[in-house]
């Protein structure tokens, strides 16, 4: 019997880094709506009273960067200087250039199927059968806590909540099976006039209890609600925010490896994003097919080259068929060339702002979460 603890964290849509991610992806969506073939690499920086949007964008579209920025911040909930940030009065600075022609010549091809990767790099995808969405439980429930925080803030249940929040959950495992939740941390920005006693009680009753399954909670479970005792100053006033600084929150909460490339603000020609989505799609279909209980996929690319330079399948001893056979199935049923995976997952649509808070994986509305290849994989593996 081997027991261990594993912890993952998430942050709300009002966290400074997530504000930046959402602005970058809102700009991307606005451009893709007009020009699906645009090349976009959009970075955002937020600090007290200001937003800077920069990067390299090559497109036939015209979008209003300032209006997109203000609308995004407004939707998150920063609409008053009392919160330290106001969508209506913050400065918006734009510093956008064009994509290098040296990169263009390596990516664009007369035959779309020969489209090269927009950069070199390695990407991972992961799936596990420990939750119904085939994601690790720690990151799944960490996301759900901060999603619930936003819900009760916006619907008026707890009107004194403010947009910035963080969650963290420690799960206890026995032989890789969940046996309970050891610790829950939730820190939320709040109005000045709420007492800590009322805050603790409301967070427990309205956020934590409705989300966490009771069978995983016991008398030993520890709760840390606003452990510093006060969280009035938050958002960009408390910390500056940057696109791409929450890559573990965005993916698997540390339970799988990460190639290092961020997602937000990048169009699908950037394999940092699109190939990570494809790797999740592959891993999820392998687990959904019952070919493994856990699966991690690695793919890698060279700039300007269409075919992946490597494909790796790791199943942690849970595979039902040999790993060598799994790799052959991946190569047969999944086109992991940049253009191929864009077509396979239908990525040239404005779907990205929704990904920029509460995780890119484990959410059914995204095409890389489909399990439409599970049946054919199972048949090809001879497990029917």
UniProtKB/Swiss-Prot annotation:
Main location: cytoplasm
GO molecular function, one term: magnesium ion binding
BP term (GO), one: S-adenosylmethionine biosynthetic process
Database matches in Pfam families: S-AdoMet_synt_C, S-AdoMet_synt_M, S-AdoMet_synt_N
Pathway membership: Amino-acid biosynthesis; S-adenosyl-L-methionine biosynthesis; S-adenosyl-L-methionine from L-methionine: step 1/1
Domain of life the protein comes from: Bacteria
Annotated EC: 2.5.1.6
Compartment(s) where it occurs, according to its Swiss-Prot or TrEMBL record: Cytoplasm
Record family assignment: Belongs to the AdoMet synthase family.
Protein name, entry field: S-adenosylmethionine synthase
Gene of this entry: metK
């Amino acid at each position: 019997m081997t027991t261990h603890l594993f912890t993952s964290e998430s942050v709300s849509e009002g966290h400074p880094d997530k504000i930046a991610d959402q602005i970058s992806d809102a700009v991307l969506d606005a451009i893709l709506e007009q020009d699906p073939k645009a090349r976009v690499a959009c970075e955002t920086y937020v600090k007290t009273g200001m937003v800077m949007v920069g990067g390299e964008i090559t497109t036939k579209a015209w979008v209003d960067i300032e209006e997109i920025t203000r609308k995004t911040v407004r939707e998150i909930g920063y609409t008053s200087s009392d919160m330290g940030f106001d969508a209506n009065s913050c400065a918006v600075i734009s510093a956008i250039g064009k994509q290098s022609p040296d990169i263009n010549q390596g990516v664009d091809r007369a035959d779309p199927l020969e489209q090269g990767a927009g950069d070199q790099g390695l990407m991972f995808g992961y799936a596990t059968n420990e939750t119904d969405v085939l994601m690790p439980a720690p990151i799944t429930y960490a996301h759900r806590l901060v999603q619930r925080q936003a819900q009760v803030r916006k619907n008026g249940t707890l009107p004194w909540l403010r947009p910035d929040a963080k969650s963290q959950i420690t799960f206890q495992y026995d032989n890789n099976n969940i046996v309970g939740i050891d610790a829950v941390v939730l820190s939320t920005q709040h109005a000045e006039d709420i007492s800590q006693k009322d805050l603790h009680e409301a967070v427990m009753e309205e956020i934590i209890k409705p989300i966490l399954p009771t069978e995983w909670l016991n008398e030993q479970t520890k709760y840390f609600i606003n452990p510093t005792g006060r969280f009035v100053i938050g958002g960009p006033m408390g910390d500056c925010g940057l696109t791409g600084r929450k890559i573990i929150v965005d993916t698997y909460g540390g339970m799988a490896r990460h190639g290092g490339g961020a997602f937000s603000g990048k169009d699908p020609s950037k394999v940092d994003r699109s190939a990570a989505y494809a790797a999740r799609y592959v891993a999820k279909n392998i687990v959904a097919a019952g070919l493994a209980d856990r699966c991690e996929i690695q793919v890698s690319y060279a700039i300007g080259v269409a075919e992946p330079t490597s494909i790796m399948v790791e199943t942690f001893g849970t595979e039902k068929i040999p790993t060598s056979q799994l790799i052959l199935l991946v190569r047969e049923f999944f086109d992991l060339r940049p253009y191929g995976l864009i077509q396979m997952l239908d990525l040239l649509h404005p779907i990205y702002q929704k990904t920029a808070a509460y995780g890119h994986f484990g959410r059914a509305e995204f095409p890389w979460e489909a399990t439409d290849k599970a049946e054919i994989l199972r048949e090809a593996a001879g497990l029917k």
